[in-house]
Amino acid sequence: MKFEDRILNKSIPEWKFYNINYEKLKVAIKKVTAYDYDNPNDSGMEKLLNQCSVAFDQEFQNVNLFVSLKIKEISTRILSVESSIIDFSKGLNKTSRNRFNLRKLKIINAHVDDCNFELQLLSRFLIIQRIALRKLFKKLLNEFPQDSENPLTASEYVTSIRNSESLRNGHEGISFMKLDLDPYLLEVSLIVDVLHDLENKLEDATEPAVEQRSLNRSDESAHTSSSPEANNSSLPASPRSIPLLSNKKTSKMIDSSLEFDTALIDKAENLGRFLLSSEDIEGLKFMLLNIGFRIIDDSIISTSKEILDTTDNINSAGNKSIRSAKSFNDLQHTLSLSKQKNILPSAVQSNEKYVSISILDTVGNEGSPLLLTDDNINQHPNMIVSSTAEDTCIVMCHVGGLRNHVVTNDLLLRDVKNILSAMRSGNDTKNISALINSLDPSPISKIALEWIQSHRLKTIEPKLDFKRTRFISADNGDIYLIALDESITIGNVSTLPFPILEIKKLSRSSGLSQTAINEDNKFKQLMKSVVTNEFQCSLIPPDLTTWKICLELVHSNELQNDLFQLLLRDQYKLNSDDSLSPDEFFQLGKDRLEEEFDLTGPINNSQGSVDSGRRVRIHKKSKQSDNETKKKPIRYWNEFDEQEEDNLDNAFYIDTNGSRSTTDNEESLLLRNSPPDYGFILFSRNFINRTYDFCEKLRNLIRHDKKTSPDLFQNSKHPHCSSTNYGSVASFGSQSTSASYDDVQRYLQYQQQDIEDSQSIYEYRHDEVVTFLYLSALLTSCIMASVCLGIVLSLFRGQSNNEIDLEIQNILIAIIIISLLVSLILICACLLLLFSRFTLAPIWHYVGCFTMFFSVTGTVCYGMIEIFF
């Protein structure tokens, strides 16, 4: 498919007429590149270049005009929402119904969602325009003619277009190439935080009101219960994409960037790590806001709290100073003019705060850190996480053992640097210990500092610096953390060309298996949103953490190609000289993402065949070769196998997902995954077991079977019980015999239960129950058809139809018709049940069932003919 058609397919349908006219610019470029110097009829080269520049300039002006108007429209709506929040905050202290206030919040939240959705569409629109322009520039650079009559080079001409007034400054200072939507993202996130805090404030105000209402007189309470205020327990969830959080406990567990980063590297379970295309960063951020995630930013959190704290001051300031406030910024300016305390901060600044990671290792491991060879250390290495804007830091030490690692965030960065500097200077151990004790650290912090001291750890190169955007969402008691790391710089030398998206979960249950991760509803919703919005991303293997990727690529000369080789080495066979383009790499990532999480992306023919346009042939590694390289589980002398010798390679463990051992959930899942039932009629396992037990009880009742054979252990127990024992030794022996008997009985019960739960026993019971059902249906159908046939013959053949005079003739005919139809349904169900067995039935079952089927069918047809004709 042509590139211009791909632009139309990817663009927003309502805005497709505002896209860059790719076809028009391509024709202008083609005239320049196809210039024939030998043809005197062709126009001059300079004229063609001017025409091409004018065409570019016109398209830039059109796109810039639309973007300028759209961003101003969104800004106006955001200011209107902020003004509504200010008015709402001013009226909170007045007497008003909480249900009415919550409804107002819901309406404001709907407008916020509209603004966020418009920003997401605008982000997608800008990405499409930038891709189209980059494609056009690439075409110019590759096909630009060079001749003595045209001394201008391709790069110079493209640079002149890039530096044009319409592209640099845009329309009224807004250019689609330079427009940054991050400030709008922070502003929307601030509004969402204020709405959450206002909702929590309303809920807190409702609780004492309910207590006071319970102390009122009975007539007043009766009147109150009938009023709308009594039914304000909760409003239905907002149908919009940005929900109002009602769970205050989960939303306040992590309320700072420091706590977020601590939880991210400490107790959070990894759900997935992805390499994201740089073009989809802004769109992904707005999409996360749409599906209920909130941004964790210290400036936003502090601003939200201070806005709520100013409610009383706003009310006391008078209408004169508040009347003209149209936004949070105007409100702060108005309050400063009235010489009040500077209680509201200025606009939420998008000042770039970078996160730094310094890896700690022992002396001599600078060239090959331990985390490159040990995956346990790789997941929780010795490192220091700090921020450029704060003096606090996070220290993590891999101590091993049951604790595995310790993490602390109550140390100052300068104190940790002083200790590391003292160790490098060769200070005495006692002096360093005294320095540690002088800090008065917490127990965990002291363990971390003493670990650094005892193992003589020091910072190694390279140092990692990156910009981090944090998102959080609470769902069913679980907290989901998303970290988007951009501009990852490796030792101030090189920068990763793509950001890394990391998704983790603070779960109530630890140790998530891969099956549990893939079945996580929130994570699955997130992955579906990524595929639906056509974001380009690729799943990173779990063993490749951000710091390991950077350490692997620290000496790379071709960073992008080596990064692709590193991420694909476990799934695909690539030669060292193979070079993938970003589109090819992310297409492979999309295929794996859909396969890994059982997702189906939108049908997009614009992508074309992946293999058809690929410059490098890629062969996927077979899973069999991967399984062969895995180590077999270690067997010990006291392990016994009760399975067949050829089952699971004589392994004691049930080895699933390539792990050394399995959890109880995985074993139960493996046992539940029985061979599928392909019968015509399917039954639940519970129904089969209950029906079989009922049939057994009925059979025993008919045969008058009784349990006449006592247990072997019960017979052997009576002689010991009948004999008289004296003394403590005899008494102890009697008690131990009784205890061992109970243990054996319980063991036999468990063993019997395991046997009954096995697949072979279930198949046997299934066939027995199905046999009982189809034989019963066969017998019932034959009896009903025979009785109906006798009645029909006696009524319609015994005498003439005109002589039949019965008062209940119509009722009798209806009963006969219904009985014939029921017998036909039963005989059909009999055949379906016959072919629903796991094993083949005896041959006489098939002969008898088919014979009776044709007989009953003929009887039904004959009866219907006699009745109606």
UniProtKB/Swiss-Prot annotation:
UniProt-recorded name of the protein: Vacuole transporter chaperone complex subunit 5
Coiled coil: none
Other notes: Present with 172 molecules/cell in log phase SD medium.
Membrane topology, Vacuolar segments: 793-810
Residue stretches making up the SPX domain: 1-154
Residue intervals passing through the bilayer: 772-792, 811-831, 849-869
Entry's localization field: Vacuole membrane
Phosphoserine modifications at: S238, S241, S316, S324, S327, S609, S612, S668, S760
Organism: Saccharomyces cerevisiae (strain ATCC 204508 / S288c)
Biased composition (Polar residues): 223-236
Cytoplasmic side: 1-771, 832-848
Function: Regulatory subunit of the vacuolar transporter chaperone (VTC) complex. The VTC complex acts as a vacuolar polyphosphate polymerase that catalyzes the synthesis of inorganic polyphosphate (polyP) via transfer of phosphate from ATP to a growing polyP chain, releasing ADP. VTC exposes its catalytic domain VTC4 to the cytosol, where the growing polyP chain winds through a tunnel-shaped pocket, integrating cytoplasmic polymer synthesis with polyP membrane translocation.
Keyword Transmembrane helix: yes
Subunit architecture: The VTC core complex is an integral membrane heterooligomer composed of the catalytic subunit VTC4 and the accessory subunits VTC1, VTC2 and VTC3. The complex exists in 2 different sub-complexes: VTC1-VTC2-VCT4 and VCT1-VTC3-VTC4. The VCT1-VTC3-VTC4 subcomplex is mostly found on the vacuolar membrane. The VTC1-VTC2-VCT4 subcomplex is observed in the cell periphery, probably ER and nuclear envelope, but localizes to the vacuole under phosphate starvation. Each subunit contains 3 transmembrane helices. VTC1 is a small membrane protein without hydrophilic domain.
Membrane topology: Multi-pass membrane protein
Annotated spans, Disordered: 205-242, 599-629
One GO biological process term: intracellular phosphate ion homeostasis
The keyword Membrane appears for this protein: yes
InterPro entries in alphabetical order: SPX_dom (IPR004331), VTC_Complex_Subunit (IPR051572)
GO CC annotation terms, alphabetical: endoplasmic reticulum; fungal-type vacuole membrane; vacuolar transporter chaperone complex
PROSITE patterns the record matches: SPX
Alphabetical UniProt keywords: Membrane, Phosphoprotein, Transmembrane, Transmembrane helix, Vacuole
